[in-house]
Amino acid sequence: VKYQNLSSIKRGVVKIGGASGNNLEYLVKELSERVKRGEEWLLVHGGSSYMDNLSRALNMTPKYVVSPSGFRSRFINSTDLELFRAACSVFSIQLVSSFGQRGVNAVPLYPPDNISAVAKRKDVLRVTENGKVRLIRGNCSGFITSFRNDSIFALWDLGALPVLPPLAYDEKGYGVLNVDGDRMAAAAAASLKAEVLIILSNIPGLLQDPNDTSTLIKMSTLEDWTELEGYSRGNMKRKLQ
């Protein structure tokens, strides 16, 4: 994929989802070319399909919840978190290998050894089940409160490609938390003063009708925000925000 209008970019953040169906070949090829010509890029990745595969192998059923505002997310308890960290490592290793084959040094940054995102734990979640709102406890996910970019700049100085999983350090020092990958990418882009944030997914994009790909909204501006928000559903709400 060639981004004709991004030919002059010097610094950017790209996020690739962890869901099945993503083709990494073109991303790795173009990002490798850009890094080799001196551009500074950060790659943020998800881990959902890898988590699903590990869960099935261990006969564990993933638990998904929906917030009252319509956001769908995976519920992560302490056991799930260890499994999710392993799943992210599998994806990171795959990416490191793919970029290495093209002569690019991709370096994963994992907390607590390398802290980029810092988050506040959301121990209690409000979820909607059967039309009712209830509270569930034991959640090991969080929302990002700050972002440290020293390690990323250090890797850029070495001509490397930093790779970030959707994991953050607990602001109270209690270990690692799962965070939303899209919001991780957005926080990183803001902290690094990136010229562009690109979020790649296995779906076409924002659709006026989720069942009709011909209704894809190819381009818009902030002036159309209210209209765009009306079209967003499920996880697309988070990507827009």
PLM ranges: what are they?
Residues 1-241:
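Nucleotide/pyrophosphate-binding catalytic subdomain
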